[in-house]
Swiss-Prot record:
Gene: rsmH
Protein's UniProt name: Ribosomal RNA small subunit methyltransferase H
Subcellular location field: Cytoplasm
Organism: Streptococcus agalactiae serotype III (strain NEM316)
Recorded family membership: Belongs to the methyltransferase superfamily. RsmH family.
Role according to the record: Specifically methylates the N4 position of cytidine in position 1402 (C1402) of 16S rRNA.
Gene3D superfamilies xref list: Putative methyltransferase TM0872, insert domain (1.10.150.170), Vaccinia Virus protein VP39 (3.40.50.150)
Length: 315
């Protein structure tokens, strides 16, 4: 593995094992990242099995070509450089209309966070960027410097759930009227200066939620996840499974809701039984999310907020 793309995979065995791998099946890793899940999944496949791996970051794909070389050489893995919201169209273009399982590791990968110039981290000084796909035009700089006060408040509340959203948006408006806000450090200081002394004493970095909100907005993370997970459930063969790792309450709430909608049915009044065409297409494999073990939590700080939800196609 290349040194500049080091990544400790979260819930590695749980995520893949819960897919109940069929050696000759067709599988998808919707979030290739450091290729940890892909590597373990490929190790479970026989010569007739195949993995399709998505990532919109070329660096991740370049790294995976090296890490997964033996599977590349046997033709068992196909890399797709695109946002996973285009899951269905990419697979259908490759002649794939049905899959046996798919896994998601949502959020930003550790290498992206650690790469200073990507501008994801409030801990390192860097240009405001936060794009997972470097080819897209919208950046964190654009959000911070061009969004109206009301739009900033909206995304800070909606995606950051920060109770100081109005104060932070107002302060951003004041500062950018003098000169553009161009670095992560500048933004982090503005956020800190907008919060009360009592709030600043709380555990965790005061800029964390706002940086999360801007990152979600720049990459339309929740919209992409919503579209992709729905497509994934439609692509699953009967008995196929979907595993989703989330890292914050918004992702987890979305996943839980999508799984609930697909695994329950509103029975019209007066119907003595549920007709076949109204039966749910999915069932929950685990009602409560699977959490990392104590051993994993001690070994990998990033695992602390991780939750794994799994569902199975039943018709």
């Amino acid at each position: 593995m290349t040194n500049d793309f080091h990544h400790i995979t979260v819930l590695l065995h749980e995520t893949v094992d819960m897919l109940d791998i069929k050696p000759d099946g067709i599988y998808v890793d919707a979030t290739l990242g450091g290729a940890g899940h892909s590597e373990y999944l490929l190790s479970q496949l026989g010569p007739d099995g195949h993995l399709y791996a998505f990532d919109q970051d070329q660096k991740a794909i370049d790294n995976a070509h090296i890490r997964l070389k033996k599977y590349v050489d046997t033709g068992q893995v196909t890399f797709i450089k695109d946002n996973f919201r285009n899951l269905s169209s990419n697979l259908k273009a490759l002649g794939v209309s049905e899959i046996n399982g798919i896994c998601y590791d949502l959020g930003v990968s550790s290498p992206q966070l650690d790469e200073r110039e990507r501008g994801f981290s409030y801990k390192q000084d860097a240009p405001l960027d936060m794009r997972m796909n470097r080819e897209q035009s919208l950046t964190a700089y654009d959000v911070v410097n061009t969004y109206s006060y009301h739009d900033l408040v909206r995304i800070f509340f909606k995606y950051g759930e920060d109770k100081f959203s109005k104060q932070i948006a107002r302060k951003i408006e004041q500062v950018r009227a003098e000169k553009p806000i161009s670095t992560t450090t500048e933004l982090a200081e503005i956020i800190k200066s907008s919060k009360s002394a009592k709030e600043l004493k709380k555990k965790g970095h005061p800029a964390k939620q706002i940086f999360q909100a801007i990152r979600i907005e720049v990459n339309d993370e929740l919209g992409a996840a919503d579209e992709s997970i729905q497509q994934a459930m439609d692509l699953l063969a009967v008995d196929g499974r979907i595993s989703v790792i989330t890292f914050h309450s918004l992702e987890d709430r979305l996943t839980k809701q999508l799984f609930k909608e697909a695994s329950t049915v509103e029975v019209p009044k007066g119907l003595p039984f549920i007709p076949d065409d109204l039966q749910p297409k999915m069932e929950l494999v685990n009602r409560k999310p699977i959490l990392p073990s104590q051993e994993e939590l001690e070994a990998n700080n990033r695992a602390h907020s991780a939750k794994l939800r799994v569902a199975r196609r039943i018709r």
